[in-house]
Amino acid sequence: VDEEQQVERLKEFWKEHGKGIVAGVVIGFGLFYGWRYYDQHTLETQERASSNYQQLTAELSEGSENAVLEAQEFVSENPENVYAQLVALQLAQHAVERTDLATAVTALQSVVDSAQDENMSALASIRLARVLIAQEQLDAALSLVKKPLPEAYAGFAAELEGDILAEQGNTEEARAAYERALQAGESLTPALQMKLNSLVKS
């Protein structure tokens, strides 16, 4: 009798809760395999991006005719991918070497806008500021180097800020920026020493 009662209880339990249990199991399996698919898809995407990065950087180094267009397309289609951001940095360097500053600005700006890693974003910001200075877009460059950056880039940013302020004729502010560069750990290179000396003389 006890066994029969247990069976009946199981039947009643299953009748009341069976659909929910099945649904839970199905959802559980769905989530499990969904995450497995997501992980696999993510891995495959990263592997393709890595392969494209290696190919494109090699082509840029070799000066391939189609390298710039292919790199621009890759960066445009994958702005948040780290490999695409590395390609953008390489593309910008390639463009600067060929005095194509507009292409360099576009590539670096994409990294500044999309990079989730603060160091990647900071590196792109410093490089972009240098290109903007070369284009005489001093206000735009100044806004980049004055924004909060990781400590490792503070010295570079302060020196660039000094360069911009000196170019704008703000001697006292430029000197203060160079001093901050030294305090941030930037080495007193001959170039930085010359900049400070020129401000003293002026």
Question: Which residues fall in each region the model found?
Answer:
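Extracytoplasmic/periplasmic C-terminal soluble domains
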Residues: 142, 146-202
